[in-house]
Amino acid sequence: MRQTFMANESNIERKWYVIDAEGKTLGRLSSEVAAILRGKNKVTYTPHVDTGDYVIVINASKIHFTGNKERDKMYYRHSNHPGGIKSISAGELKANNPERLLENSIKGMLPSTRLGEKQGKKLFVYGGAEHPHTAQQPENYELRG
């Protein structure tokens, strides 16, 4: 009788991928990157083990929004003090800190558990076209959409 394959830390092979975000839609890009970080693009995917790959996203400042989201979509954070809510539009966040915009979007699609935090640490986002991970010899990854 055959047993279902279960991945563990000893038999996981991780790759490094570079994804160019120039002209890509925020949500579509984020969902594909989240799937790669979780390892769902592999046949060895195991839900309780981190089987995902490392992802480097470049040109985060050239991400694309559909409709009026750049003006209308708001991001909120709170300082835990009375009246401490802060809001910023997606367009302002893209202009000020495009890395945080993409990181928040991708990490929001990962599980809110210790495993999800571990998977989120394999994400590297850069606003420009340069990244310091050339020693890892990352492969270019073409998105499906």
Swiss-Prot record:
Q: Recite the UniProt keywords alphabetically.
A: Ribonucleoprotein, Ribosomal protein
Report the Pfam families cross-referenced here.
Answer: Ribosomal_L13 (PF00572)
Q: What is this protein called?
A: Large ribosomal subunit protein uL13
Residue ranges that the Swiss-Prot or TrEMBL entry lists as coiled coil: none
- Protein's organism: Staphylococcus saprophyticus subsp. saprophyticus (strain ATCC 15305 / DSM 20229 / NCIMB 8711 / NCTC 7292 / S-41)
Supply the Gene3D superfamilies for this chain: Ribosomal protein L13
Question: What is this protein's function?
Answer: This protein is one of the early assembly proteins of the 50S ribosomal subunit, although it is not seen to bind rRNA by itself. It is important during the early stages of 50S assembly.
**Record-stated family:** Belongs to the universal ribosomal protein uL13 family.
What's the subunit arrangement here? Part of the 50S ribosomal subunit.
GO cellular component labels:
cytosolic large ribosomal subunit
Report the superkingdom from the record. Bacteria
Q: Which GO terms describe its biological process?
A: negative regulation of translation; translation
Citing just one GO molecular function, the answer is:
structural constituent of ribosome
